[in-house]
């Protein structure tokens, strides 16, 4: 065809994400990590997205890009994972303490029996725990490597 249908591209992105390996110890991750799978995807042409051809950008924003995601790790820039965070209880939530090398935090909150994922900048160290029965946090360094996940069950 002259161009791929937008729905085909969205379905391919969703399929790639469903096969991506998860961080060891992350909520919902298998007991063993490192299974083969895609860690990300690349779009051939940014102009297609910028011009929203065939509504592709809109479909991606409403579908697989509606939720936060981490940039795939770049292990060729070093394979030592960052130190993990420490979670401290405070009024209204938690305080994340971690290494100066942190670029962001990978945050999972268990709300109503479902794990919800978010990404926070490293300078944002306060974590709202309203409605959460558990929280898990990992340090993410500038090359996308994750630390071990710190899990805290909340009362």
Feature roles, as predicted:
Residues 127-146:
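Beta-strand-rich modules
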Residues 65-101, 144-155:
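Pro/Thr/Ser/Gly-rich low-complexity, intrinsically disordered linker/stalk tracts
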């Amino acid at each position: 065809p002259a161009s791929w249908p937008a729905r085909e591209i969205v379905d391919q992105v969703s399929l790639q994400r469903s096969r991506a390996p998860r961080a060891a110890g992350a909520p919902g991750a298998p007991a063993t990590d490192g299974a083969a799978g895609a860690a990300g995807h690349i779009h051939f042409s940014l102009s297609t997205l910028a011009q929203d051809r065939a509504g592709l950008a809109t479909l991606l924003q409403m579908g697989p890009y509606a939720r936060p995601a981490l940039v795939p790790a770049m292990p060729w820039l070093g394979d030592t994972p960052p130190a993990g965070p420490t979670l401290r209880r405070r009024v209204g939530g938690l305080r994340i303490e971690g290494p100066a090398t942190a670029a962001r935090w990978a945050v999972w909150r268990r709300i109503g029996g479902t794990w919800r994922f978010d990404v926070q900048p490293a300078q944002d160290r306060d974590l709202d725990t309203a409605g959460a029965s558990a929280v898990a946090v990992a340090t993410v360094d500038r090359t996308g490597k994750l630390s071990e996940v710190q899990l805290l069950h909340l009362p």
